[in-house]
A protein has these predicted regions:
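N-terminal hydrophobic targeting signals that begin at the initiator methionine
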Residues: 1-2
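N-terminal single-pass transmembrane signal-anchor helix
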Residues: 6-38
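Alpha-helix termini
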Residues: 23, 37-40, 77-78, 95
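Alpha-helical protein-protein interaction elements
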Residues: 26, 52-53, 135, 147
Length: 161
């Protein structure tokens, strides 16, 4: 007859719980880095859109001596904002500015693009985050040094290019 110790070759409940705990800790440490890497790739697509938009607004301004009133009149056929972003054109006719806000993301931030012919901060693209949202600020810091005044209570901005 075989002994009792020869039959039990599995893991105990405590050993399984320790393994699950270790996997959970590793996943918690890796998840923010994964989310940041995904956001960086999404911003890459948004930056390409921003540059194309900026160049198109510049061409429109050179041809008509004014900013476009709608993105529909631009020469590059921008029909949709990049996936995961919401485009706002409220200042397009007055400043030629494009605002893209990240929607439903792990943290909040926006990209502001100004054409080269703009009298205010010409040709710049900024990453903007609320000072109340630490994750958005950390994400914008990935792109460069803070460019806003530390006394500005609402917005934190970083010059992307």
């Amino acid at each position: 007859m075989k002994g009792f110790s020869d039959i039990s070759r599995g893991f105990t409940l405590i050993e399984l719980l320790v393994i699950i705990l270790i996997i959970g800790i590793l996943a918690e440490l890796a998840l923010p880095d994964y989310q940041r890497a995904v956001e960086v790739s999404r911003v890459g697509a948004a930056l390409a859109y921003s540059r194309a938009f900026r160049d198109s607004v510049d061409r429109y301004y050179m041809a008509h001596n004014r900013f476009p009133t709608s993105p529909d009149v631009l020469d590059i056929g921008l029909t949709e904002c990049p996936k995961y972003f919401e485009c706002r054109y409220g200042y397009l006719a007055t400043e030629g500015k494009l605002e893209m806000w990240r929607k439903n993301g792990p943290f909040e931030y926006g990209l502001f693009t100004r054409p080269t012919v703009s009298p205010y901060m010409p040709g710049t693209i900024y990453c903007i985050a609320s000072r109340k949202k630490a994750q958005g600020i950390e994400f914008c810091q990935h792109w460069g040094e803070e460019d806003s005044s530390p006394d500005e209570p609402t917005w934190f901005s970083v010059l992307v290019q």
